[in-house]
Design a protein with these regions (language model features):
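Acidic catalytic/metal-coordinating carboxylates
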Residues: 43, 69-72
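Short amphipathic alpha-helix used as the core "switch/output" element in two-component signaling
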Residues: 71-82
Length: 135
């Protein structure tokens, strides 16, 4: 019983992938403030390694990377993990970009810098609480 209570109180781990150092630092602080443990990755290869290790409550992906893109990363994660929620948090704001992210297997797509909807969307995807948003 104590192990079950301890597990339910443990901070959920969120993988955040972005090749911009300032964004990674900001997300580290925000996720900690929101009560989550951030697993930060600067590259697609680091992100895949963290995702394959498991134990994540959510993956937050940027759309564009120097070496690849978040759409391909989302597909690669979905190839071995169909359960962990994925959301995009990106400056790529065209409708086509958003649709590609959702088609690749993400449940949500927020356009940076949408801080008003970031925490509610994270909470909704992890806990199933809060208003559904796609911005």
């Amino acid at each position: 019983m104590a192990a079950m209570i301890s597990a339910s109180l443990a901070r959920k781990r969120i993988l955040c992938v972005d090749d911009d150092e300032d964004t990674r630092d900001m997300m580290q602080v925000l996720l900690d403030t929101y009560g989550y443990d951030a697993v930060i990755a600067a590259s697609v290869s680091d992100a895949l390694e963290s995702a394959k290790a498991g134990g994540l409550a959510l993956c937050i992906l940027d759309h564009w990377f120097t070496e690849s893109n978040g759409i391909e990363l989302c597909r690669q994660i979905r190839a071995f993990d169909s359960n962990t929620p994925i959301m995009f948090y990106s400056g790529a704001a065209y409708k086509g970009d958003i649709q590609k992210g959702l088609d690749a297997g993400a449940q949500a797509y927020l356009v940076k810098p949408d801080f008003d909807h970031l925490k509610p969307t994270i909470d909704l995807l992890i806990h199933g609480v809060g208003p559904a948003t796609h911005h």
